Amino acid sequence: MEKDIYEKIMDLAKRRGYLWSSFEIYGGIAGFVDYGPLGCLLKNNIISKFREQYIIKEGFYEIESPTVTPYEVLKASGHVDNFTDPIVECKNCLESFRADHLIEEFVDVDTEGKTLKELDELIRKHNIRCPKCGGELGEVKKFNLMFVTSIGPGGKRTGYMRPETAQGIFIQFRRLAQFFRNKLPFGVVQIGKSYRNEISPRQGVIRLREFTQAEIEYFVHPERKEHEKFDLVKDEVVPLLPAERQMDENLSDDEKVIKISIGEAVEKGIIRHQTIAYFIALTKRFLEAIGIDKDKIRFRQHLPNEMAHYAIDCWDAEIYTERFGWIECVGIADRTDYDLRSHSAHSGVELSVFVELDEEREIETYEINLNYKVVGKIFKKDTKAIEAYINNLSEKEKEEFVKNIENDGKVIINIDGKEFEILKDYVEIKKVKKVIKGEKVIPHVIEPSYGIDRITYCLLEHSYREEEDRVYLDLKPSIAPIKAYVLPLVNKDDMPKIAKEIEQMLRENGIIAEYDDSGAIGRRYMRADEIGVPFCITVDGQTLEDRTVTVRERNTREQVRVKIDELVDYLKERLKE
C-alpha cells in the first residue's frame, strides 16, 4: 500500500533532521516532538518572518514571561474552570479517550459544541466501544487540560504550565501601558512554549502537548475598533466561512465558503469590525509569504456554541492537509475586556488607561461606594473583587448600574463566571459634578494567536514535490533552512579547498551554507533538493581558470555562472524571494 503524503513527509523529516520523535530510545511519548537541526532552522525562519511582520512593520513590541504560572492567575483568567475537554474511560482496560474525537471516528457527526450529556447519548446510541479492547465506555466527564505543578518546596503553592502565552502580557498590563505612554491602541507580542495535557493525541505534530505559540495582544479603545491602516488591506480578497453559512443545511461544503474583499466583509457585517478584519488580512499575507498554498487557506468563524469563554468573536485561519483535512493554525479573537477586568477584580489592582479628552468638560457622574457593614458579612472574601469591579466601571457603565438598581432594586454582576446580586442597600450612590480631562478605560483586546508547529508541518506538506527522478521541498529561499550547498565537482586539484573557502565566505556574510563532497555530483544535488536547499554552488575546472562557479536553482535545475567575488550579492538578492 502506497504511503500517504503525511507518512512520506515524516519519513523525510526523520531521515533529514527536520522532526524526530521525543524520548525515542525510551519508546517515545505521544504529543511531543523534537526539532532536528533543519527543523529548528525552518521553525526559526518562520518565527523571524512573524517578527518582521508584527514587530518591525507593525511597530509592536515583544516581551517574555515565565511558563510556570501561579494558580491565582489562571483562576482569574477562567482556565482553572473552563480549559477542559470531554474525556471517556474504558471500564475494562481503563484507557482514556477524548470523547468528541472518538465519536467522530465511528459516526459521521459534527460534535463541535455538544454538551457532555449529548456526547454520552451519542456513545450509547451508536454503541461505540473502546477501540483498544472493545470494552464498554464509562460516562463522559470534563478533564482539565493544564499540567499541574507546585511552586517551591512542600507543594504549598499550586502552579500550572501555561496554557497560552497571553496571560503573561495581561498581568504586566500596567507596566506595558506606561511603556506605551497610555496611548491606545498598542500591540504586544509573546513567542514561546505553551502546554496542553491532551487526552489522547493521535495526530502526530498536529496535536502536541507542548507547542510553540506566537501571540499578539492588541489593546484598543472599546468604542474605537476601526483600524488606521484598514485602507491598505480593504481590497484583499479572502475565503471566509461565516457561522451563519456553516449552519445552513441547504448549502454544500464548497458553497458555504465565500470569497470576498476584506472591506466588503466589514461593510456587510460578516466580520465584526475593522481590527479583526485587518488581522485576518495580515494573517493571509503572512501564510502566503512563507509558502503556504493560497488555495488551501480559509478563515472559519467560530459558532456561538464553540466560542471560547473570553471571546465575543473569533475567526480561525485553517489550512488544508491531505490526512487531517482543515486544521486550525491561527485564531483571531476579540477577547473584549474579559482578561483585564477579571485580573483587576481578582488582584484588586486597577488595570485601565486614562484616555485624555481634547478639552476639559464638566459632567454629572455617580460615586458608588460599597456599604461594608452589610456586604462584608454577605460576600466575605469576594468583597474585594466586587469593589474592584465597581471601581473599574466607566462613566457609561456607572449610569447603567444606577439606572438598573433604581428601577429594579438590584443589579446582577458577573465576575469570572460567578454572579453576584447587588441590592440597593448594599451601595451608597451620590450624584456629583466634576470637571474631567479624560476617562478611565479598560481596553478591549484583539488577539491573533499563531500555532507555529502546525504551520511548520503544513509548510512542509505544501512544499513537498515528487518527480520521476527526485523528491524535493519547494521551500522559498527566504524560509529554507540551508540556503546553499557548496560542492567541489571532484575531490582533486584545488576544488575542495576553494569550495570550503566559499562556504566560509557565505557564512561570514550571514548565509547558511553547507559543504558536501560525498558521492557523485548528481547524488549530492538530489540530497540538497530533498531537504529544500534552493541553490547548489559547484566548483569545477573552469573555476580554477576564471574564478567563476555554477549556481544551480533547485526547482528548475537551471545553472548560471557567477563570479566568486559577486556570489554573496547574487545570493542575497535571490534569497529575498
Swiss-Prot record:
Residues that bind substrate: R98, E164, F211, T212, Q213, A214, E215, E447, P448, S449, Y450, G451
Function as written in the Swiss-Prot or TrEMBL entry: Catalyzes the attachment of glycine to tRNA(Gly).
Organism this protein belongs to: Methanocaldococcus jannaschii (strain ATCC 43067 / DSM 2661 / JAL-1 / JCM 10045 / NBRC 100440) (Methanococcus jannaschii)
Keywords: Aminoacyl-tRNA synthetase, ATP-binding, Cytoplasm, Ligase, Nucleotide-binding, Protein biosynthesis
Subcellular localization(s) per the UniProt record: Cytoplasm
GO cellular component: cytoplasm
Gene Ontology biological-process entries: glycyl-tRNA aminoacylation
Annotated coiled-coil segments of the chain: none
Similarity annotation: Belongs to the class-II aminoacyl-tRNA synthetase family.
Enzymatic reactions: tRNA(Gly) + glycine + ATP = glycyl-tRNA(Gly) + AMP + diphosphate
Gene name linked to the record: glyS
Binding site for ATP: 196-198, 206-211, 328-329, 451-454
Protein name: Glycine--tRNA ligase
EC number, UniProt record: 6.1.1.14
Pfam families cross-referenced by the UniProt entry: HGTP_anticodon, tRNA-synt_2b
Gene3D superfamilies the UniProt entry points to: 3.30.40.230, 3.30.720.200, Anticodon-binding domain, Bira Bifunctional Protein, Domain 2
Superkingdom, taxonomy of origin: Archaea
Alphabetized GO MF terms: ATP binding; glycine-tRNA ligase activity; protein dimerization activity
